[in-house]
Amino acid sequence: MAVQEAMRRELNQRLKLDPAKTAVLAIDTHRGHLDPEIATMPVAADIAAEVVQASARLIEHTRAAGIPTAYLVMHNRVVNGRSEYLRNPFWAAVEDVRASLTPDLPSTISGHNLVASPQTEVMPELAPGPGDVVITAKHRLSSFLDTDLDSWLRALGTETLLLIGINTNTCVQCAAFEAMNRDYAAVVVSDCVNSMYGEDLHDFSLENVARCFGWVLTVDEVIGKLTPVAGGVAV
């Protein structure tokens, strides 16, 4: 463990963030997960509030540095009276046994993030700004599959992705895998992600990313790397 921690510190020191070549991916930072009043697949309310607060702080700094954000928002259409979510065999099976994907909280697969529902709205505290893009063609765990995300990133000359959002162990980790496969530097911002599935899978996923294919940094660490330096000292 000491060897792994030493390696992680060295890797974190080597990571440089060039605002001109960096983008934020805000993955499913919508009301369907993060607004306890209407969420259809809710993160626990206290955790949701922490993720929103940390993410708002991150975006304030990245936006000031000229870094754009892509908002990936899950959308599901109703086809023949049934959510297209239920074309997936596993999700259909969970729906059939009326099981909840969220420990200790009710959730609905068939009613999750239907097109034009309020659940598909980005949390107001994280609202898109000029130069940002909202991608609504996300229908599964992947932020890249059948979307124009990669095209947008390539057009910007992006090399590094700051990943935030829900869920750490599904959509966020999937984005980190796919970013790595496309030769982006994947950085998961640890206090800007969490999971409706529970802390065990959240923690496992952060460890998996950090040890295998990307960086895991806190908001403070990211801000520190974006802060201009004078004489080698952050100002």
Predicted regions and their residues:
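Short, well-ordered beta-to-alpha junction loops that form the rim of enzyme active sites
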Residues: 72-75, 82, 138, 166
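Short beta-strand segments at enzyme active-site cores
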Residues: 27, 67-76, 80, 189
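Catalytic P-loop NTPase motifs of RecA-like helicase/translocase cores
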Residues: 33-34, 196
